[in-house]
Amino acid sequence: MRKKRSAPQKPKVTYRVNGQIRVPEVRVVFKDGSQEIIKTSQAIKMAEQEGLDLIEVQPTATPPVCKMDNYGKLQYKLDKNDRDRKKKSKPTSLKELRFHPNTDKHDFDFKAAHLEEFLRKGNRVRATVVFLGRSIIYKDKGYELVERLTERLSTVSNREGSPKFEGKKLFVYFEPDKKKIEVHERMLAKMKKEQQNKEAEN
């Protein structure tokens, strides 16, 4: 089984600080936006006097650009941003279910419910209509099934483009819609509560 290739990770941002800055002079950008080229040793002393660190932010510039800041707080902020970025970039998996042009109502409802559940969990889904043997002559039934499925999943997703044929298979993709899912979840919770109240009355 072929392993999924993981996406390349961005290198963690690190800065040279105080004594790690080995160049003779640096360009210091002050909080008011002004800049000055001064000796590195002098810049470090100025930062220390303010209870701050001299941080090299543009090492490739000539001379390197530095600013005075609290390195611990800066690194904490960078780490937090990195964690947030990783959460947002978490890949969604693709779930697939297969149908046939003559899929009966029970089977259709069963599979559509599974696709809906996949979407509610944030997964992208693909529905494939498989045409076996001479059933390829019923392409219109395949398209009708896709339209029914699109309507059924519209409360939690958006269809990606138009359905496409590849050989004897008709593919259609759906992506989860967070706002729709939130509304759908609230509606389900309301219906469940109403049902519980009704049962309690009886």
From Swiss-Prot:
GO terms for biological process: ribosome disassembly. This is Translation initiation factor IF-3. GO terms for molecular function: ribosome binding; translation initiation factor activity. PANTHER family: TRANSLATION INITIATION FACTOR IF-3 (PTHR10938), TRANSLATION INITIATION FACTOR IF-3, MITOCHONDRIAL (PTHR10938:SF0). InterPro entries: T_IF-3_C_sf, T_IF-3_N_sf, Translation_initiation_fac_3, Translation_initiation_fac_3_C, Translation_initiation_fac_3_N. The lineage of its organism: Bacteria, Pseudomonadati, Chlorobiota, Chlorobiia, Chlorobiales. It holds the Pfam family IF3_N. Keywords: Cytoplasm, Initiation factor, Protein biosynthesis. It is found in: Cytoplasm. The keyword Cytoplasm applies. It comes from Chlorobium phaeobacteroides (strain BS1). NCBIfam families: infC (TIGR00168). GO terms for cellular component: cytoplasm. Monomer. Belongs to the IF-3 family. IF-3 binds to the 30S ribosomal subunit and shifts the equilibrium between 70S ribosomes and their 50S and 30S subunits in favor of the free subunits, thus enhancing the availability of 30S subunits on which protein synthesis initiation begins.
